[in-house]
A protein has these predicted regions:
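Acyl-donor (CoA/ACP) binding surface of acyl/acetyltransferases
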Residues: 1-51, 68, 83-200
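Short histidine-centered catalytic/ligand-binding loop motif
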Residues: 52-57
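Active-site rim helix/loop that mediates acceptor-substrate recognition in acyltransferases
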Residues: 59-80
Length: 200
């Protein structure tokens, strides 16, 4: 049994990205583990939490699929998909989820997204999370450009993205499909030199 634990430890360290976990003042953005299922599902079933996300509210099976994909992505090399748990640094309590996906490797471009459980809205955690993702993208992955999509009605996210220095580049008409309707999205982006100039 001891050899198996050593092998598993070596394997995990081989796949662990040097940019992870991401530290912010109050949070850790870390890789998901299987034991996070109940904490993720608790918030992912909430229609208010998933109102502006691409999917949700989740069924049990949806959360299982999400976590399975997140765990599988951790072992792909080169790694291009970072779906991460947002947890309190002090006690590892899960507040939500975030992600950074390298969507255009040749152009060094990535896409970020996030959601937080309702009890944690209005405390600056979303801004802290996005700042952490930008650090991972620009410093850890050496990306040139990071984008985000945002529903025009999602005033909180618009405020958050603009606060971290992302600029609105346009309105994508009928870009996504949810609740049986095609919906417009705002496109936000930030370049590496803009992030550096803003003092990270």
């Amino acid at each position: 049994m001891q050899w198996w634990n050593m092998f598993r430890s070596l394997t995990n360290s081989f796949y662990r990205h040097p940019g992870l976990p991401v530290n912010t003042s109050r949070l850790l953005l870390r890789d998901f583990v299987a034991a996070d299922h109940a904490s993720v599902h608790r918030y992912a079933v909430d229609p208010k939490v998933t109102q502006y996300t691409e999917r949700g509210p989740n069924r049990e099976a949806d959360t299982k699929v999400f976590l399975a994909h997140a765990l599988a992505a951790q072992r792909r090399l080169p790694r291009k998909q970072f779906d991460l748990a947002v947890v309190l640094k002090q006690d590892d309590y899960l507040l939500g989820a975030c992600g950074l996906h390298v969507t255009q490797p040749l152009r060094n471009e990535g896409y970020l997204g996030y959601w937080l459980g309702r009890p944690f809205w209005g405390n600056g955690y979303a801004t802290e999370t996005v700042k952490g993702l930008l650090t991972l993208g620009f410093q850890g992955l050496e990306l040139h450009r990071i984008i985000a999509y945002c529903c025009p009605e999602n005033v909180g996210s618009i405020r958050c993205l603009e606060k971290v220095g992302m600029r609105q580049e346009g309105r994508l008409r009928q870009h996504t499909w949810k609740h049986g309707l095609r919906q417009d999205m705002f496109l936000y982006a930030i370049l590496a030199h803009e992030w550096q100039r803003a003092g990270r």
